């Protein structure tokens, strides 16, 4: 994960809700329509509760359970996935249609 370019206008497209299983997958709430289109808008900028932002590329999204599940580079266990609970997913406005 890298630091984002703060000069771009960012749009919130989702939120992470903690671990799904024990392999580092993360429950994902998408604000896009259709819901799965959130995967097309990358890189994601992840903003935690303290307002700290990190860029994340190569995220894979699938349907699972009662919603979407994200697999993110560098998140490989339940503890790392749970640490992302409440994190907002943002993308540059320029990435949207």
Model-derived regions: residue spans:
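Short Lys/Arg-rich amphipathic alpha-helical segments
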Residues: 1-97
